[in-house]
Amino acid sequence: FLYAFRSIIRSRGGKMKKTVYHGSDHIIERPKYGYGKIYNDYGVGFYCTENQNMAKEWGVSADKNGYANRYEIECDGLKVLNLNMRDYTMLHWLTILLENREFDASTPLAAEAKEYLLQNFHLDYEKADIIIGYRADDSYFSFAADFINGAISYRQLSNAMRLGKLGQQFVLKSRRAFERLEFTGYEIASVQEWYKRKASRDHMARRQYFDLERNRRQRGDLYITTILDEEMKPDDPRLR
């Protein structure tokens, strides 16, 4: 499959360097390859963001300060799967979620949709050194589940993923990527400031979803039932 490097900044003699941040409840100078939760969005990996403020939100809990660990990584020669590029659709991202996150396909429609997406929109993402794509926390995963169950359209799902401006994840998957990562410092995220921001962002996304998106059907909207009935494939222009 295709790899895209357009989001990587060239610097220092033409090499591709990127600054990324990881939110955590502790300082992590040397992330461990192969360590982490298997049910994360893109499987086991080291989950980062290019947005330091977002890392601070990810690092805090309701009663504990967090840390935004800062790193530099040289991406020259690494295979980067950027799911935001035009080569891919929202269904490619959703299929990766279905392969990793626990999803209860309790209805016949959801079960059929899951099987169809896995057969037709699967990517060999495990071959990538780095994956760039949406982050699906609990709120956003529920939006994806609504699409699979036929409650919202493809257009509504695409719009919903931008609610709250949750941002993109920059996920290190391979040993090669881990070896390129250089710890350059950290900033403390105080629970008083950043947990409030975190809760506010999630609340805003949910409110906008139910107020603006979930009940705003448009004529011609594309639903999962149509995708299944017409056996739509990744090259269908309606998915772009």
Model-derived features: where do they sit?
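Short, flexible loop/turn elements at secondary-structure junctions
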Residues: D25-H26, Q52, C75-G77
